[in-house]
Design a protein with these regions (language model features):
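Conserved alpha-helical segments that form or flank metal/cofactor-binding pockets of metalloenzymes
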Residues: 30-59
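Acidic, low-complexity proline/glycine-rich segments
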Residues: 1-14
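Helix-loop segments that flank and shape redox-cofactor active sites
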Residues: 12-35, 57, 90-97
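Short acidic DE-rich linear segments
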Residues: 125-132
């Protein structure tokens, strides 16, 4: 996967994630998604700046993000994108080792979010379940 495609898909993921965050009726889901999209925005900015320092300017397109309704599927799709990019870069660790490490930090954040979504969202309930 070229860095241009990776950048475009990463921006699209953040847009979908932010939309899911705003649409959810579950407070724990709202918070978990907010943590991830804020982390991803800072992470992606830092990663792409470092890449441009390493390899020159990146020309990428802003792609239309396909809407999703399931936040777990959305995060898992992005983990797949991260794993593909990481796998290709890992073939030349001497050159891309720093990038592999950065991608792994984003994967870690995704896995933490998946843990929260799978274990806390359904257990805490939604607004209509509150005794108010």
């Amino acid at each position: 996967m070229e860095i241009t495609e990776f950048a475009s898909k990463s921006f699209a993921f953040r847009d979908v994630l932010h939309m899911l965050h705003l649409k959810t009726k579950s407070y724990p889901e709202h918070i978990a998604l907010e943590e991830l999209y804020k982390f991803q925005l800072k992470w992606l900015d830092s990663f792409l700046e470092a890449w441009q320092g390493f390899d020159g300017d990146i020309e990428f397109d802003i792609v239309h993000a396909e809407p999703k309704t399931n936040c777990i599927d959305c995060v898992m799709d992005y983990v797949g994108i991260l794993m593909t990019a990481k796998g290709e870069m890992a073939e030349d660790m001497e050159t891309y080792g720093w990038a592999v490490n950065e991608i792994e930090s984003m994967m870690k954040q995704c896995f933490q979010t998946l843990y929260k979504l799978k274990n806390f969202v359904d257990n805490i309930g939604k607004k209509e379940d509150l005794p108010i």
